[in-house]
């Protein structure tokens, strides 16, 4: 297994999640199906709670905006002739419709996030990480390396995944989190913003991601980069392979101070 020698200036590792620390199938094959299979039960159990009603209100507002779309599913306002059962079924149908088109509306993401939080806390869901991830980040921390997450998923969602993982609570191994509020992952400025936020130079950061466009944006900002190749990730072209340093496991990351 070829080693990736980390340049001496690096004191920070910035990690992507999907396809890097976590199987890319986790969201598609675990998180999304959980919502579809449990949304009605969740709404029945939490319907009277303020948070749930706020989620429904946001979905109703989104439904009004979507009324011009083909096949859109309405959610009636809470007038007296609409029973709770009828309202819940309307919300379920609307969520199914949105998810069938892989939509990312704020209202949908908010409800999904609350459902996942409940499932993580109750133990119904566990965040998945590749087997090489935890031993590697523990070793890096022993070397004094700081570790941050940068994902398109919200910081709250990141903390749930790592806080309730199959390997236990991993948040204590991480120094911080970034999401797209710091900037989009394919824009170089985002990586300079992250360096400024951490309080280091771009050249002090090694970014690990499975997405070549993100790697090139980070590299343009002055970061060191390795593209992580995992089963199920998007295939790399020959040009990608020639332009990027590639690894298949975190175990290939080697620091000068390691024996």
Curated annotation (Swiss-Prot):
Record InterPro entries: Enolase-ppase_E1, ENOPH1_eukaryotes, HAD-like_sf, HAD-SF_hydro_IA, HAD_sf
Pathway: Amino-acid biosynthesis; L-methionine biosynthesis via salvage pathway; L-methionine from S-methyl-5-thio-alpha-D-ribose 1-phosphate: step 3/6; Amino-acid biosynthesis; L-methionine biosynthesis via salvage pathway; L-methionine from S-methyl-5-thio-alpha-D-ribose 1-phosphate: step 4/6
TM segment ranges: none
One annotated GO molecular function: acireductone synthase activity
Catalytic activity: 5-methylsulfanyl-2,3-dioxopentyl phosphate + H2O = 1,2-dihydroxy-5-(methylsulfanyl)pent-1-en-3-one + phosphate
GO cellular component entries: cytoplasm; nucleus
Residue numbers binding substrate: 151-152, 185
Subcellular location: Cytoplasm; Nucleus
Enzyme Commission numbers on file: 3.1.3.77
Cited Gene3D superfamilies: 1.10.720.60, HAD superfamily/HAD-like (3.40.50.1000)
Binding site for Mg(2+): 16, 18, 210
One Pfam match: Hydrolase
Named cofactor requirement(s): Mg(2+)
GO process annotations (BP): L-methionine salvage from methylthioadenosine
Enzyme class: hydrolase
Highest taxon listed in the record's lineage: Eukaryota
Recorded coiled-coil stretches: none
Co-factor remark: Binds 1 Mg(2+) ion per subunit.
Keyword line: Amino-acid biosynthesis, Cytoplasm, Hydrolase, Magnesium, Metal-binding, Methionine biosynthesis, Nucleus
Role of this protein: Bifunctional enzyme that catalyzes the enolization of 2,3-diketo-5-methylthiopentyl-1-phosphate (DK-MTP-1-P) into the intermediate 2-hydroxy-3-keto-5-methylthiopentenyl-1-phosphate (HK-MTPenyl-1-P), which is then dephosphorylated to form the acireductone 1,2-dihydroxy-3-keto-5-methylthiopentene (DHK-MTPene).
PANTHER family referenced in this protein's UniProt entry, alphabetically: ENOLASE-PHOSPHATASE E1
Subunit structure: Monomer.
HAMAP family membership: Salvage_MtnC, Salvage_MtnC_euk
Family: Belongs to the HAD-like hydrolase superfamily. MasA/MtnC family.
Protein name: Enolase-phosphatase E1
Organism for this UniProt entry: Xenopus tropicalis
Taxonomic lineage from the root: Eukaryota, Metazoa, Chordata, Craniata, Vertebrata
């Amino acid at each position: 297994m070829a080693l990736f020698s980390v340049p001496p200036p690096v004191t920070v590792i910035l990690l992507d999640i999907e396809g890097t620390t976590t199987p890319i199938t986790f969201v598609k094959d675990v998180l999304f199906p959980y919502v579809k299979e449990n949304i009605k039960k969740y709404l029945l159990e939490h319907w009277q709670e303020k948070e749930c009603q706020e989620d429904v209100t946001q979905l109703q507002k989104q439904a009004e905006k979507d009324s011009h779309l083909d096949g859109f599913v309405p959610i009636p306002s809470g007038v007296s002739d609409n029973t709770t059962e009828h309202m819940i079924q309307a919300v379920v149908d609307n969520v199914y419709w949105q998810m069938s088109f892989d939509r990312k509306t704020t209202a949908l993401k908010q409800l999904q996030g609350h459902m996942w939080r409940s499932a993580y806390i109750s133990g119904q869901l566990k965040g998945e990480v590749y087997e090489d991830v935890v031993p590697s980040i523990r070793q890096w921390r022993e070397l004094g390396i700081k570790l941050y997450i940068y994902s398109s998923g919200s910081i709250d969602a990141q903390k749930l995944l790592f806080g309730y993982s199959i390997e236990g609570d991993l948040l204590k191994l991480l120094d911080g989190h970034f999401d797209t509020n710091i900037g989009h992952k394919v824009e170089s400025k985002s990586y300079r913003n992250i360096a400024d936020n951490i309080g280091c130079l771009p050249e002090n950061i090694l970014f690990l991601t499975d997405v070549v466009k993100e790697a090139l944006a980070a590299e343009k900002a002055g970061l060191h980069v390795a593209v992580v190749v995992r089963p199920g990730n998007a295939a790399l072209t020959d040009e990608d392979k020639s332009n990027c340093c590639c690894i298949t496991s975190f175990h290939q990351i080697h620091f000068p101070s390691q024996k």
